[in-house]
Amino acid sequence: MSKKPLILGIETSCDETAASVITENEQGNPIILSNIISSQTDVHKEFGGVVPELAARSHIEKIDLIVQKALDKSGKKIEEIDAVASTAGPGLIVCLSVGLSFGKAFASSINKPFIAVNHLEGHALSPKLVSNLDYPYLLLLISGGHSQYLKVQGLGKYKRLGTTIDDALGEAFDKTAKLLGIEFPGGPQIELWAKKGDPNSYDLPKPIINKGGCNLSFAGLKTAILKISKTIKTEQEKFNLAASFQKTIEEILKKKTKIAFDEFEKQNKIQEKIFVVAGGVAANKKIRSMLINLCKENNYQSIFPPIEICGDNAAMIAMVGLEKYKLKKFNELDYPAKPRWQLDESALFLKGAGVKL
């Protein structure tokens, strides 16, 4: 029996310091041996958002410990690692540089290959960590830095069907939470507040809802929330605004996802249609429920990766590294950090397509 490759993955693109060790089984499917994630919520809470310099400093302080924890939990020794995969972009360059430099140094010290990974590719292929999916499939990536519809055709093969033309959905959730007085990161709390409110209290805008294909826009919605928040006087009104915001997002995603379905089907005449949702916002139960029902209505199989691999994590980075390792797609140690790095290189660059701000 041949030795299965062991890949160390490192992720520091924003405010999570993460490391993971993965291998594969006899069928070639990835197996997560460890997946350690250290969040920086307490570091950034008082500022109401991520401060890049503080995030980078925290990465520097923690990365040695996090990588060691990943190795310890995996039960593997340093010398057993076959390759090191680090996120090279997109993201905050001061944060990317920490994990990228560490990964290069680690790989060099054990004389093993180094692999640079696109953070978005990690999200795009993350379902492969838990499901033996066939290509192609339709992906909705919704996180704090990205909101995109992508046709996933395989490693390195992506076609962007739609993207946000301004702000990411996760950012809209976090900014709305901040305006309502919810502590950072408040996005996940919006759903809880919405349960206490009337979703029909406010008629909020749905930017480009009837144009732009399956492109998305949330800047106008954020502006409307800002104006209304200045008139709010009671806690119940805050709950009502949260509920109206949640409802509006669901309506936008329902309409745009149906358009994405139609576009995907035009390009792919296949029997089994698969729709995957990844990214931190995929944890929102109301959005999940709406999208699951939409899939049933349109004969799509819906797949939501587990919460621990929906957000930023190193298992998805290691998994992409594993696929590249098997194809001997290695990188030189002078590979640069890429704060802007689109998956579909042929697509027009838009603010929300491949950059975290």
Show the residue positions of the predicted features:
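Conserved phosphate-binding catalytic cores of ATP/NTP-utilizing and phosphoryl-transfer enzymes
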Residues: 1-5, 116-138, 320-321
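N-terminal beta-alpha supersecondary unit
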Residues: 5-90, 119, 123
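Short beta-strand scaffold segments in enzyme catalytic cores
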Residues: 17-23, 139-141, 147-151
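A contiguous, well-structured pocket-lining segment that forms one wall/lid of small-molecule binding clefts
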Residues: 35, 77, 192-275, 282-298, ...
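Short Gly/Thr/Asp-enriched flexible loops that form oxyanion-binding sites at enzyme active sites
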Residues: 86-111, 285-293
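Glycine-rich beta-strand-to-loop/alpha-helix junction loops that act as flexible
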Residues: 87-89, 106, 143-145, 275-284
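Conserved phosphate-binding/catalytic loops in two-lobed NTP-binding clefts
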Residues: 116-117, 274-275, 292-317, 331, ...
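Glycine-rich phosphate-binding loop plus the immediately following alpha-helix
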Residues: 143, 154-198, 222-233
